[in-house]
Amino acid sequence: MGIVRVTDGEPRESKRRDGRALLIKGARQLLAEKGYAGMELRDVAERGKAPRGSIYHHFPGGKRQLAVEATRAEGKEIGALIERSLEQRGLRGTLGLFGEIFRRRVVDHPERIGCPVAAAALARPEDPELAAAATESFRSWEEPIAAALLGEGVSRADAETFAGLVVSTVEGALIRARAAGSTDPLDSAVGGLAQALDRLLEATR
């Protein structure tokens, strides 16, 4: 049996990945709080507990690259939650999941009421690359919902329309929740979507 050697580079590589992940996490928080224009690199470095210069080490493209990757990370994380929820809780339960995700932000971190993906979307037309990352993320949330509706016998056109309605309604409710400092708009939005889902499924039977 050969000897397995752990090289000095492996711990450094792990530390590098951890540092990069912390910066992305900080960028996601700041996008939600302040939007892209208000996201300062010094604040990202502070959130990530990293020297400001390390941002350019991990993200040579600077603020834009960091924001794009933070947007994609948010999209990927929520997309994975949606897919898992659809498997475990079904369509109605997944509508509730949207409310739960953002309700926690309103309650636990009022200063972070917002969605990094929505903040990135507002960058168009000044930054089409960032807006494209937001569009990609929104689509990754809509597609599994539409697929689940297709599995229930809903037509493709109606499934895609309803999936888009879910994302648009929740994002709009999040803006209202931020203005009100309350979860009520989210609760109302999720309740309304649940009723619309019931009507849609009933119409296919």
Label every model-predicted segment.
Residues 82-114, 162-166:
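Hydrophobic alpha-helical connector segments
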Residues 22, 26-69:
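Helix-turn-helix
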Residues 105, 123-126, 167-184, 197-205:
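Amphipathic C-terminal alpha-helical segment
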Residues 1-18, 203-205:
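N-terminal intrinsically disordered/low-complexity leader segments
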